Amino acid sequence: MLEGPILAVSRQTKSVVDIPGAPQRYSFAKVSAPIEVPGLLDLQLDSYSWLIGTPEWRARQKEEFGEGARVTSGLENILEELSPIQDYSGNMSLSLSEPRFEDVKNTIDEAKEKDINYAAPLYVTAEFVNNTTGEIKSQTVFIGDFPMMTDKGTFIINGTERVVVSQLVRSPGVYFDQTIDKSTERPLHAVKVIPSRGAWLEFDVDKRDSVGVRIDRKRRQPVTVLLKALGWTTEQITERFGFSEIMMSTLESDGVANTDEALLEIYRKQRPGEQPTRDLAQSLLDNSFFRAKRYDLARVGRYKINRKLGLGGDHDGLMTLTEEDIATTIEYLVRLHAGERVMTSPNGEEIPVETDDIDHFGNRRLRTVGELIQNQVRVGLSRMERVVRERMTTQDAESITPTSLINVRPVSAAIREFFGTSQLSQFMDQNNSLSGLTHKRRLSALGPGGLSRERAGIEVRDVHPSHYGRMCPIETPEGPNIGLIGSLASYARVNPFGFIETPYRRIIDGKLTDQIDYLTADEEDRFVVAQANTHYDEEGNITDETVTVRLKDGDIAMVGRNAVDYMDVSPRQMVSVGTAMIPFLEHDDANRALMGANMQKQAVPLIRAEAPFVGTGMEQRAAYDAGDLVITPVAGVVENVSADFITIMADDGKRETYLLRKFQRTNQGTSYNQKPLVNLGERVEAGQVIADGPGTFNGEMSLGRNLLVAFMPWEGHNYEDAIILNQNIVEQDILTSIHIEEHEIDARDTKLGAEEITRDIPNVSEEVLKDLDDRGIVRIGADVRDGDILVGKVTPKGETELTPEERLLRAIFGEKAREVRDTSMKVPHGETGKVIGVRHFSREDDDDLAPGVNEMIRIYVAQKRKIQDGDKLAGRHGNKGVVGKILPQEDMPFLPDGTPVDIILNTHGVPRRMNIGQVLETHLGWLASAGWSVDPEDPENAELVKTLPADLLEVPAGSLTATPVFDGASNEELAGLLANSRPNRDGDVMVNADGKATLIDGRSGEPYPYPVSIGYMYMLKLHHLVDEKIHARSTGPYSMITQQPLGGKAQFGGQRFGEMEVWAMQAYGAAYTLQELLTIKSDDVVGRVKVYEAIVKGENIPDPGIPESFKVLLKELQSLCLNVEVLSADGTPMELAGDDDDFDQAGASLGINLSRDERSDADTA
């Protein structure tokens, strides 16, 4: 095992079977895992615990390494690294130590409400030493507010919940590489020494067999120049590398005689154009590789170099390079080039000589949240260090105190910048519980110091054998980020060096032991690993003579049982949590499984959740760890339960009250609602789920509904993946979800005076104001639709010269008569709903508002969205489709007992997509709904009884089943159970042994000629709702320059009639239609007003004029000093300026500003 502070030691959490009150699932699993899945949020929580050094983390470290072990947190490490900061003369120094946190200023809910950070003040002890007088001054210094992680692994930044994603990067270390020379077709070898921080050092052998070196990507020079610069004599070089002809020939031709010449030569190559001196050259070389301030391998880099070059742990604490490192690297390179397979290291250890695979997980490590924040704090502290040095030289030595030296702004700015703008600090995906959980377990190769999606090739994106058990081969986005963003596998954890480990069961002499070892990808390469389904007896002895195993580089082989070293702990070890929730995954094509895993994260929580008939056994654990359930840590009795809170009288006599979150808006606009699961007086145990969250049912992840599905075409209405639904689903709110939108408005100080929130809005009827209270804010419970006023607001207009009458009115009525504009907040186009919440912040109530803002109001509008044509539905196997038709219940096909089908899917959606899992799920779903009874005495069931677990012989109707991935129900078991399914209450078996039933056409009452596959499938309603996509415009805002309509629903834009559409019109010869589209329907500013007037007055449409964009084009050409003129038919130049006066008057008389641009539209929104 590796030594050092455990970064993310996985704590054994509750086993699913131990969770009190867990619903029973009948599982088809044949393999029992010796350990439970580790805590699914440990990746985030443990890394942050290491950073700030929580008491629990310190206790675990001491337990692991003994009481006397020195335990340092991430923050302590940086302060030790930085201290002492000395001035340029070395007379004074400042040391920082003992970081500690005070209590957090606001609760999580307060931080969300006030749009501030959930953070705790960080203090450090600063000690100033005056070396000349020996005087020591010590003070506690406030560094800034440090964002704290919530118990769900998230951060609250500016009131929104964010997640810091772990980054996959190339590990520091030494990497050997081989390329084939195009001209000679000989292999050429190179090596890179990559530090965590500092200059790269590269050696290579070129096609002329000379060994060269590049320092920090600069010009190449002979490697012997570097060795001589390090103080090696020609004799020493010959003694060490005399075995290599290419080194000797390089030595002869290097052109430098001694150390001084070599140093100057290196300086010339590194700093061309500067005058070299020996001291400058020496300090350049020292700073590049041998000074800890400038060069840092990090512990992981030192570990990788020692391991690759066989240098042992004799200088484990040294984070810079040594001469021995450089010499051994060169020796390894020349032996590799010579084709040798092994070499003896300076320690006498025999090590293999081979090139490295950069995509291997032994060479890629994780920067988890703690390390990412630590790096950012380091950046801030190094900026602060410069300020401290400057202040030491400028201030009087007698009066200096630590606080006068330290400027904490760079540190807090660096932290703020990271959380606010870094690519790895992301707006949390709160669409449902699963999407939040998988977001926290995401691994990204993008971000600062990582890859960019433009430069990443196929190799780095591809699935690698070393991903097994570490990163899921299925769950990754479609599109440009494919393969660059992954998900941590179910059982994986992160070791002290940031490498991902996965657990294996130890096998000794063909016998299983109780020992579980976590192996990195490098370590695993040395062992022979068997699959989790390897047969063994009760004693643990492997029963098969030969076993299928995995060798290095993913090769599969058959070996004798005594040759096996390890065995997988579980069949679902290789997949992530999201993928592990797809039943019959083993029967799905990988492309469709990828879509299935991703689409589960897009499912919207429904009003009434329902657990899937066919699960995988992962639903309980995923929901438990996601953090959206309410779990009681104490045992006791429920003393009070309501929709808003649950009070438990604990066994020790203390009362615990749990507040439930009701109808809160998530980041994605879905509804976050918790519902109690316990009753008054009920006994609860520690660890029991007492309230469900969004998308959970009885503590299980429940993202969709079980629907009775028939696979058949229906009049072509389910062509191309369209879906036919039963009207009953709409009426009974089976696929109905609640969506909450937040609308915000603020009243500011303007140049002309302060804006005012008021009910007194000019030119607005009382009917429009009926739902506003006396402050001008909409009442809670009001039903609103697009265009309705939510908050009344008036803004002062520019004052004009007042007439005597107006001055008189102003004198009598005071301010009321002044000019104001209506800038009220209205419901955006296309939105409706019910007002469920109002938040009012004002400067008078001492709320913290942005400068210039006097009041801020937030309105929450909830909308109940029933399923409708155009909404997207999906199963868990990548089988997605759009609702094409909602049929009346009486027209739907029905079973002989009168049960109508809920949903019809097209059979063509299955074969070429090869996601057969959906068909098997349908069969098992029917079985779970109907129940089954297997008679063990019946000879026809003999084979079935052999494989079926004993508790699955009798299963009642309406039961929940589990078919774990790669270890689920077999085809034979499904066929056997279908033959033994229970009849309905009339004694009839509806579905035959082949999983098909005779369906009757709801319209004619005639049975269909062929039997139809029917059963229950778990269907999800995805967040691609037609309400959010459908859009239409008659008039609206125009772009300020081209005067063409804006684009997109958010801008209330038009539909672009593009180049290809114009060609289509030209091809049809539709000249007048085309002219209209390009002028009066687009940017003929005068023409469109005249057309509007003609339509209103019922007159004929006038002829189009000149489009504005044509005028813009002319102006742009003229700006290039080209004299472009428009000529009439007789050749005389034409003036293109439109008659603006007429057009303004026409618009005014109609009471409409048709030419409004982006700005004025935004003001009136």
Swiss-Prot record:
Its EC number is 2.7.7.6. GO terms for biological process: DNA-templated transcription. It catalyses: RNA(n) + a ribonucleoside 5'-triphosphate = RNA(n+1) + diphosphate. It is an enzyme of class 2 (transferase). One of its GO terms (cellular component) is DNA-directed RNA polymerase complex. Signal peptide: none annotated. Keywords: DNA-directed RNA polymerase, Nucleotidyltransferase, Transcription, Transferase. Disulfide bonds: none annotated. The keyword Transcription applies. It comes from the Bacteria. One of its GO terms (molecular function) is ribonucleoside binding. Belongs to the RNA polymerase beta chain family. The RNAP catalytic core consists of 2 alpha, 1 beta, 1 beta' and 1 omega subunit. When a sigma factor is associated with the core the holoenzyme is formed, which can initiate transcription. DNA-dependent RNA polymerase catalyzes the transcription of DNA into RNA using the four ribonucleoside triphosphates as substrates. This is DNA-directed RNA polymerase subunit beta. The gene is rpoB.
